[in-house]
């Protein structure tokens, strides 16, 4: 029969107290057990058009060549993308930009060197979907819902940094953008803005890629209110 010495530490698992006494663990905000997000019907939103918005690079090869050149000058590329959600018949739908027949992307893009992530995403959202009558869109961005890294100058991205990678080439952050009850969006003519239901995205990497198809899991922590 073993006896616990009287001076033995009573901290650590399973009592919920870290054995390090919080010496190496940064204090965080109190855990939010339920995060509520208001969703509004797709019919509440008006979609106009504006001049085409073209990619900086003419091909995938050109994109990685530019990434390589910029990495040598300014380091890792920082990218932000916005997740906009509406509902139809009380089913959440994510707004996606469609280019051609098979390519889908979230609105967003590259940050400028030193640019704040949230302010940069607001700038990009305005460039891509902002209205043209001079009325500024109020983008509400409170939640980062995902991080993806590109370890090499190649297409694969991962929701973690592989163990052997010390200098990722790109860091992509996904943010939930909370929409107002009503809004007007101006969509570049070379894109379509489509509302894809979560059940279509789920486990559908062949159709939407690994990042967009992971959104149902990332969004499952929210409590949606269907207005």
Curated annotation (Swiss-Prot):
Consequence the record notes for mutating residue 103 to W: Reduces affinity for UGUA RNA by over 90%
Reported effect, residue 63 to S: Reduces affinity for UGUA RNA by 99%
Main location: nucleus
Result when mutating residue 81 to A: Reduces affinity for UGUA RNA by 12%
Region (Necessary for interactions with PAPOLA and PABPN1) residue spans: 81-160
Subcellular location: Nucleus; Cytoplasm
Motif (Nudix box): 109-130
All copies of domain Nudix hydrolase, residue ranges: 76-201
Site keyed Interaction with RNA: positions: 55, 63
Record-level Gene Ontology MF annotations: chromatin binding; histone deacetylase binding; identical protein binding; mRNA 3'-UTR AU-rich region binding; mRNA binding; protein homodimerization activity; RNA binding
UniProtKB keywords: Acetylation, Cytoplasm, Differentiation, Methylation, mRNA processing, Nucleus, Phosphoprotein, RNA-binding
Pfam families referenced in this protein's UniProt entry, alphabetically: NUDIX_2 (PF13869)
Modification after translation (UniProt): Acetylated mainly by p300/CBP, recruited to the complex by CPSF6. Acetylation decreases interaction with PAPAO. Deacetylated by the class I/II HDACs, HDAC1, HDAC3 and HDAC10, and by the class III HDACs, SIRT1 and SIRT2.
Positions of the UniProt region annotated as Necessary for RNA-binding: 2-147
Modified residue annotations for Omega-N-methylarginine: 15
Family stated for the protein in its record: Belongs to the Nudix hydrolase family. CPSF5 subfamily.
Binding partners and assembly: Homodimer (via N- and C-terminus); binds RNA as homodimer. Component of the cleavage factor Im (CFIm) complex which is a heterotetramer composed of two subunits of NUDT21/CPSF5 and two subunits of CPSF6 or CPSF7 or a heterodimer of CPSF6 and CPSF7. The cleavage factor Im (CFIm) complex associates with the CPSF and CSTF complexes to promote the assembly of the core mRNA 3'-processing machinery. Interacts with CPSF6 (via the RRM domain); this interaction is direct and enhances binding to RNA. Interacts with CPSF7. Interacts with FIP1L1; this interaction occurs in a RNA sequence-specific manner.
Protein name: Cleavage and polyadenylation specificity factor subunit 5
Origin species: Homo sapiens
Upper taxonomic lineage: Eukaryota, Metazoa, Chordata, Craniata, Vertebrata
């Amino acid at each position: 029969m073993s006896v616990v010495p009287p001076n033995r530490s009573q901290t650590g698992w399973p009592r919920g107290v870290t054995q390090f006494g919080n010496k190496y663990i940064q204090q965080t905000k109190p855990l939010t057990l339920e995060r509520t997000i208001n969703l509004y019907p797709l019919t509440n939103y008006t979609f106009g058009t504006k001049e085409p918005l073209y990619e900086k690079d003419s091909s995938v090869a050109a994109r990685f060549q530019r990434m390589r050149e910029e990495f040598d000058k300014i380091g890792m590329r920082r990218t932000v993308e916005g997740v906009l959600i509406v509902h139809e018949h009380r089913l959440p739908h994510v707004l996606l930009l469609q280019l051609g027949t098979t390519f889908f992307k979230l609105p967003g893009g590259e940050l400028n060197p030193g640019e704040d992530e949230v302010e940069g995403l607001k700038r990009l959202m305005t460039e891509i979907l902002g209205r043209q009558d001079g009325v500024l869109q109020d983008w509400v961005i409170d939640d980062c819902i995902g991080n993806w890294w590109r370890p090499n100058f190649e297409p694969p991205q991962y929701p973690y940094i592989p163990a052997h990678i010390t200098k990722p080439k790109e860091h992509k952050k996904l943010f939930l953008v909370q929409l107002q009850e009503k809004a007007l969006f101006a969509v570049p003519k070379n894109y379509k803005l489509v509302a894809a239901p979560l059940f279509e995205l789920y486990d559908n990497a062949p159709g939407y890629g690994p990042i967009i198809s992971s959104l149902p899991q990332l969004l499952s922590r929210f409590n949606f209110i269907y207005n």
